[in-house]
């Protein structure tokens, strides 16, 4: 045998099993075995699969690498650490490749970014929204909500994006802007507080809601015509495509005590909503059909709850978020686990439970294309749950670590058959993680990892944002490794993809930094109502000769760049 540096299997003839009829003459059988005649479907004469891509030729040209899945994560620092006031993010929203981030600052509290196909982050513009601090935001899809649905007197011809911002005083602003040319403008303002007097009971003074304690908790698009907003315990639905005289009046308003979050069924029935809260039964979830009444699942049988001790049962159940994963399945967070319900089932029991055994789960996101459910908790862990085998699953555990092992003597037989290890940690958190607040210095009181915002990009990548304005982009890549060295093959003709060691940020060139727009139609108010927009993209940036600024560090600040400014018109019709 010729010596090579690649493995060569032993040349052994393997004859497939065949049925041979019994013959009386043994001599004929011996003669047939000694001849060179072979069965018609053996490897010697069956060449139907020789060109199949599944088979790989064991030679020097092909047997030099192997392909596996790896996690690729890129991080950007959206706000600098040298600022006198620390920027605390309040929400994040993504539509297609446009990313919107909001902070609790009085100025520059909205930033628009673009995630390119090369996984580069481009800052488009900075907007200052007047009023109280922003608590939640929502990018409305351009296809379903074009700005042209409003009169031409309220919008600019260049506007192509609508934004919803919820504030601490119960106000939701509808902003129209151009992603590349700026000129942001508030075209509608929805005051939720003036509709609460009819829904608040006068016999219970504690339910009296004042503008100081009425923050907008969540806003979400609804039925391609309007949006749903949550203020304290009240659920609002507005129709943006209705008559202009009735657009500021909600088409639905109801109070649900103890509600924490909601999710609209965006698959086939937008009139069906899932509600989670502290007063929706022991499981903390309810279904709201806008055409019928409220339904609360039955009490969960404690005997089937695996891994629940007495201390765990005595804790108050907390459900903070929910998400629809199909037209008939909804997932909700309950303390440190996830419950998946089938709304067609009548037994009052979840079809599957996912045990992360980390912190309290605070956010859920689902990727319909890959069938992956993402969860984030108060300890900073982000876990990806593979739900492709949901029909056969009863319990889900982590793939790695000691938390992936669970023993139950009473129901050990049941667990071994219906437990799937389907959870992978995407972002690892720590309960006592030290945070560098300035330069490389660490303060003793700067501990904890805070809240993680989750959202899905257009290509299925996961986007995370922590409370220190660190943006992360995570994706699963097919990576080729060299068999001999075990290193990643680069993309210079020898491999298809690889994990990059640096993140890139594209900004405008030096000539764009000194440009300032000063037109006559600008409008600004004094005090806290100074509304401005900094557009960092000029027409020169769209040219092909525009070079990107490449940073070698994985995290960096973009506040060093002097941005050009333009003032927003804050008049509301």
From Swiss-Prot:
Keyword Cell cycle part of the UniProt annotation: yes
Positions bearing the Glycyl lysine isopeptide (Lys-Gly) (interchain with G-Cter in ubiquitin) cross-link: 553
Organism superkingdom: Eukaryota
Record InterPro entries: WD40/YVTN_repeat-like_dom_sf, WD40_repeat_dom_sf, WD40_rpt
A GO cellular component entry from the record: cellular bud neck
Bias (Low complexity): 500-509
Mapped WD repeat ranges: 144-185, 315-351, 356-395, 397-448
This protein's record includes keyword Cell cycle: yes
Other facts noted in the record for this chain: Present with 3080 molecules/cell in log phase SD medium.
Stated name of the protein: Protein DSE1
Gene: DSE1
